[in-house]
């Protein structure tokens, strides 16, 4: 799949990022991961991101990363395109990127770099180096320390033909508008704030109708129903699902830092697809929070 074909795929539909399965000892559980992918693939997501942020990329050893990406690519070869998360230092990100390309990933999601502080010129150089190390398409994730503006993204677009996507995890509307207006159809644009459904209608109004869904991991039917309601401007259905599920869900998620991942793994367990514990420094939900989420999911009915 060439980068432009990937860009076309990412410009439509719902995206998601499977959690990574670990066993009780905290090791990668390949059988569980295969079962998860086989469950999720038929629901209709346009693409899946393996070893992304919710897939705990930053907790994976290099050998585990290869296992996760190969398992995802092999399992979903005939059903849904797999993009691989990559990140870390520039040299590490390049190694991961080249490994993902070798294993058959259709594209890459370039996660924020490892530094706590860096100039955006330096961030742009990091992105350029990773893009130029591979031939497959790359989506850059503006989040946390990565805050590329329209000027830098325009330069990167000129230098890196395979940089085909921009995922926004900042929620800076002024920045999003400036990027969308400046770059036009050069990129596919993805909403990437945690629990993106809450912001989906607003982002669609900005010209960003595509987003990645965390809750697709455990209520895939509801996630697709919500996406279709957004697509057809069914404000009544959107509002009801936000009131009945997403706002109470946020109340649980916001209790502790890192719960954006932990709550998804808890949801997967409740749904019957236990992915095991999160790895430190993340922490799992408490028993009380787990029961609160279970009650909330029960209201959404069979998936």
Swiss-Prot record:
Q: What is its EC number?
A: 4.2.1.41
Q: Which SMART domains match?
A: DHDPS
The reaction(s) catalysed by this protein are:
5-dehydro-4-deoxy-D-glucarate + H(+) = 2,5-dioxopentanoate + CO2 + H2O
Database matches in Pfam families: DHDPS (PF00701)
Q: Which SUPFAM superfamilies match?
A: Aldolase
Q: A Gene Ontology biological process annotation?
A: D-glucarate catabolic process
Q: Tell me the enzyme class.
A: lyase
Tell me which UniProt keywords the record has, alphabetically.
Answer: Lyase
Pathway entry: Carbohydrate acid metabolism; D-glucarate degradation; 2,5-dioxopentanoate from D-glucarate: step 2/2
Cite the Gene3D superfamilies for this sequence: Aldolase class I (3.20.20.70)
What's an example of a GO molecular-function annotation for this chain? Answer: 4-hydroxy-tetrahydrodipicolinate synthase activity
- Paired cysteines (S-S): none
Concerning NCBIfam families, the annotation shows: KdgD (TIGR03249), PRK03620.1 (NF002958)
Family membership? Belongs to the DapA family.
Q: What is this protein called?
A: Probable 5-dehydro-4-deoxyglucarate dehydratase
Tell me which species this is from.
Answer: Pseudomonas putida (strain W619)
